[in-house]
């Protein structure tokens, strides 16, 4: 039973537990500030393999993450649509969205980013959702017997996020320009796979991050055009009632999505 009363105490417990688990000779120096404790915790959680954890660890982790995540929640009901009543563009932290599902830009290993404190969306989503997501993803890979293919989609619970579910997809990685037709089609397939999976699970709404535009280096302008075109075509052709949020983080992406919708309206 989780009895720790503060998130700082919970962080210290989780850090100590992961440090003991590593079974190395490094001396653990516990930081004094919450921010430094969080960075140490996050780094340890990021690099931790997909191994079982104790019920006590889960209880402490869940109490802490759910409390921290509750402090910053963005409800879909408060967003203003950019087209019709079912398509939105929103700038902010996707992990704060209270929504049926958010989309995670995963890599082919499918275990979440394992680089300590890396600021990619894969890292942030796994960190804020909890260790259970990595364990679920590891089980998916174990069952299918191979790494995840580009353009496919899988779903896990959201655990400690405000989102009920996470849809994971692996986008194409761009190594040279111009972007090939194959990679354009693969990016479109990512969006289609996520939309189909959302409808198969009878979800009401889904939020997309900007798939492949980070370390996978897909040009942001092309990616925005493909995302908007693919989602609009799917909704029209299938008569899906899904509400779709295009989540952007940078000012540049916000402008690119607005421009894409403006061109679409012309």
Curated annotation (Swiss-Prot):
Domain of life: Bacteria
Binding residue positions for ADP-D-ribose: 93-94, 107, 120-122, 212-214, 216
Record-annotated Macro domain positions: 74-265
Record's cofactor remark: Binds 1 Zn(2+) ion per subunit.
Residues given in the record as Zn(2+) binding sites: 113, 118, 120
GO molecular function, one term: hydrolase activity, acting on glycosyl bonds
EC number in record: 3.2.1.-
Reactions accelerated catalytically: 4-O-(ADP-D-ribosyl)-L-aspartyl-[protein] + H2O = L-aspartyl-[protein] + ADP-D-ribose + H(+)
Cofactor: Zn(2+)
Keywords: Glycosidase, Hydrolase, Metal-binding, Zinc
UniProt record similarity statement: Belongs to the MacroD-type family. Zn-Macro subfamily.
Function: ADP-ribosylhydrolase that specifically reverses the SirTM-mediated mono-ADP-ribosylation at an asparatate residue of GcvH-L, by releasing ADP-ribose from the target protein. May play a role in the regulation of the response to host-induced oxidative stress.
PANTHER family (alphabetical): GANGLIOSIDE INDUCED DIFFERENTIATION ASSOCIATED PROTEIN 2-RELATED, MACRO DOMAIN-CONTAINING PROTEIN
Name of this chain's protein: Protein-ADP-ribose hydrolase
Species of the source: Staphylococcus aureus (strain COL)
